[in-house]
Amino acid sequence: MVTINQLVRKSRSNKIIKTNVPALSSCPQKRGVCIRVYTTTPKKPNSALRKVCRVRLTNGFEVTSYIGGEGHNLQEHSSVLIRGGRVKDLPGVRYHIVRGALDCAGVKNRKKARSKYGVKKIKNK
């Protein structure tokens, strides 16, 4: 137990909470421009060609973000919206691209979990 005198000499310090998404600077999403769109391979037990892109954000940060879903229309100089959320098997990828926002189109022929991939509801007649 700390005494009052000890508290007078040195007050209690608050715990520093480290953010997992520093480039967003306390915003839910940030806009950026694609610098490079490429594929990369995941860590050991998994095998695939994951679609990622290097994005320069409006606040000057440059981050690698993951392009979710099957197929995409992104290329260099595309304007994209990124959100937080890491990809467990890709080291250094801590952001996701929001599908269906700005220049990034939604996933074609998507019927389930549409909101995650920027797809509008189909009108049945």
Curated annotation (Swiss-Prot):
- The reply on keyword Transport is no
What keywords appear on the UniProt entry? Methylation, Ribonucleoprotein, Ribosomal protein, RNA-binding, rRNA-binding, tRNA-binding
Q: Which InterPro entries match?
A: NA-bd_OB-fold, Ribosomal_uS12, Ribosomal_uS12_bac
PROSITE patterns hit by this protein: RIBOSOMAL_S12 (PS00055)
Mention one GO biological process in which this protein takes part, according to its record. Answer: translation
Record's superkingdom? Bacteria
Could you tell me which Pfam families the record lists for this protein?
Answer: Ribosom_S12_S23
Q: Specify whether RNA-binding is a keyword of the entry.
A: yes
Could you tell me which CDD domains the record lists for this protein? Answer: Ribosomal_S12
Entry GO CC: small ribosomal subunit
GO MF annotation terms: rRNA binding; structural constituent of ribosome; tRNA binding
List the transmembrane segments: none
User: Where in this protein does the record say 3-methylthioaspartic acid is found?
Assistant: D89
Query: What SUPFAM superfamilies does this protein's entry cite?
Result: Nucleic acid-binding proteins (SSF50249)
What is known about its subunit structure? Part of the 30S ribosomal subunit. Contacts proteins S8 and S17. May interact with IF1 in the 30S initiation complex.
Provide the function of this protein.
With S4 and S5 plays an important role in translational accuracy. Interacts with and stabilizes bases of the 16S rRNA that are involved in tRNA selection in the A site and with the mRNA backbone. Located at the interface of the 30S and 50S subunits, it traverses the body of the 30S subunit contacting proteins on the other side and probably holding the rRNA structure together. The combined cluster of proteins S8, S12 and S17 appears to hold together the shoulder and platform of the 30S subunit.
Q: Which family does it belong to?
A: Belongs to the universal ribosomal protein uS12 family.
HAMAP family annotated for this entry?
A: Ribosomal_uS12_B
The entry's protein name is Small ribosomal subunit protein uS12
Question: What lineage is this protein's organism placed in?
Answer: Bacteria, Pseudomonadati, Pseudomonadota, Gammaproteobacteria, Enterobacterales
